[in-house]
């Protein structure tokens, strides 16, 4: 039989937990078009991208 693989949890990368206040907050943004979690990319241009529907927001630097 094949050996069972242990799953690596990455929930701590997606959410911030404040135990004192009892609040769980999402670190990343949600897509305004479909509501799924967006990915933050730094290269070649900083942007937020939704892998589900293809929506992209480019980050503009304010001077």
UniProtKB/Swiss-Prot annotation:
InterPro entries: Ribosomal_eS31 (IPR002906), Ribosomal_eS31_arc (IPR022845), Ribosomal_zn-bd (IPR011332). Binds 1 zinc ion per subunit. Keywords: Metal-binding, Ribonucleoprotein, Ribosomal protein, Zinc, Zinc-finger. SMART domains: Ribosomal_S27 (SM01402). Its cofactor is Zn(2+). Zn(2+) binds at residues 31, 34, 50, 53. GO terms for biological process: translation. GO terms for cellular component: ribonucleoprotein complex; ribosome. One of its GO terms (molecular function) is zinc ion binding. Part of the 30S ribosomal subunit. Belongs to the eukaryotic ribosomal protein eS31 family. This is Small ribosomal subunit protein eS31. The gene is rps27ae.
């Amino acid at each position: 039989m094949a050996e069972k693989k242990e799953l690596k949890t990455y929930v701590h990368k997606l959410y911030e937990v404040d135990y004192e206040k009892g609040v769980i907050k999402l670190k990343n943004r949600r897509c305004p078009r479909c509501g799924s979690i967006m990915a933050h990319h730094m290269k070649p241009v900083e942007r937020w991208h939704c892998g589900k529907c293809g929506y992209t927001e480019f980050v503009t630097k304010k001077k």
